[in-house]
Amino acid sequence: MISPASIAAAFAKNPDLLGKKDINHTCSELGLTRKSIGFPGDDAAAIPDKNGWQLVAMEGFMNEFVAAEPWFAGWCAVMVNHSDILAMGGRATGLTNAVWAPNRNTASEILRGMSEASKAYRIPIVGGHTNFN
């Protein structure tokens, strides 16, 4: 049988869990604490309202990934944020986009991936920002 100390030691060295320390650094740099209006988190921000909580998620992607797979990056933009909201016990009610692309064709592929995922997950895209460079 594996001892509790061995399990704890394995968790303490897990690179995925160690990466969560980045949240503390980000919150510190932004001056966010547990007393801030929104609760800093990993999957999404939790903002209290009169009916419970609003969950807000956002994801960024590496430029190399977007350049190599623009349609899939668009799909993942929806899927990852949907997953993050679900991970916190919520239900996604809408999406916004922030797309910077080198040209209209690349942007179209990203937006097509987002649109198809939006329909597949039944989450409407309600706004956002697009910029071609």
Segments predicted by a language model, with ranges:
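Alpha-helical scaffold segments that flank or form the walls of functional sites
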Residues: 72-88
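Short glycine-rich or small-residue beta-strand-to-loop segments that form or flank ligand, phosphate
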Residues: 95-102
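Short, intrinsically disordered, charge-balanced linker/junction segments flanking boundaries
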Residues: 131-133
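Amphipathic alpha-helical segments in well-structured domains
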Residues: 78, 111-114
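Extreme N-terminal cap/leader segments of soluble proteins
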Residues: 1-68, 88, 97, 108, ...
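Short glycine/threonine-rich loop-to-helix capping motif typified by GTGT followed
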Residues: 102-111
